[in-house]
């Protein structure tokens, strides 16, 4: 029954690892429960209502992933996408948050249509195999950078853009301890090393004043202030088209990048680098975004933190089911879950980033025609703070280098350019030129 419902294979998987994987994924992405209300409330949305809708939309989308796609990936309102929603569409362009929610709804409906027609899968297949292999290490660097930043180990600098943080602060010291502890547990091959590291680091943070414990149970705030709040009279404006297309580009290629990267790490791809049941995963993403807009939150997407659950042993829909259950529990135990500091989850993000670098061995950097675009893809993800920008620039550079060097065919035919790859590059160039 478990195999039919969730794709659980008892010959290669264990319930313990699936549950640990799901809990680990939740703990590494639980920060969104604090961050999303903070960002979206800047638009005038009710922060308490946003907290509740963040949980509910994550539950619904992740359950679709568990039952329909049967994959160990979890979803929630996406970082970056929520910032674009609040700080660009509302605070910069001057539109209401209801206008932004309408754009998210339209994007979700378009995604459902693209998924049903199979067009999203064709877009994935248009990305050359070698670039798909570069996505995983690029994401690894990106989430490691996010972990270092959230821990305070690195910080912004006007002189050098980024520099070391205060290595004497309790938070940074706690994070470095968590990294060393978790790394040691991983070296010893302790099952659930990431989860154990997070929990121990959180507990040690209490006397240091880093872990802020403020209670256990609270009643979930009502979603009424933001539920089904749309603004229809502006849907045919040029700005609405631009906003919808921007949401589409960012969400599509963040999701594609995350699915390919995490699936490569989990060994859930075929010889041609194609992700298992990717179309079903796309549907979970599309449904999550559509339902999220109805509830009152920004675009829902697959979380790169799913890699932490995969590395903890999660391989089936049971992992994402566990994460969904954790989000339900979080509705009732918000103060308890929100007590986990970013310094505790930083170790998981950084070490998962290390693990995801494994795929880089499949990229031949001595072949400059493919090596340079892969380098561009990998390095731009952390430097632009965007998975999608890394993929887009990687594809553009791949096509241009092939064209200018006259190398239209690769020694591996799976890396050959075709009309779809060239069309993608043209669309990406237009995206940067006009959006």
Regions inferred by a protein language model and the residue ranges of each:
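Hydrophobic/aromatic residues within the transmembrane alpha-helices of Major Facilitator Superfamily
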Residues: 23-30, 60-63, 67, 148, ...
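Helix-loop-helix hairpins and the membrane-proximal interhelical loops
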Residues: 1-49, 163-164, 195-279, 429-430, ...
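Loop-to-helix transition at the N-terminal end of transmembrane alpha-helices
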Residues: 43-63
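Juxtamembrane transmembrane-helix boundary signature
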Residues: 59-79, 110
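Membrane-embedded alpha-helical modules
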Residues: 93-207, 211, 321-435
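Helix-loop-helix junctions within the multi-pass membrane cores of secondary transporters/permeases
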Residues: 2-36, 57, 78-87, 91-136, ...
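Hydrophobic alpha-helical transmembrane bundles of multi-pass membrane proteins
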Residues: 24-25, 33, 49-54, 135-139, ...
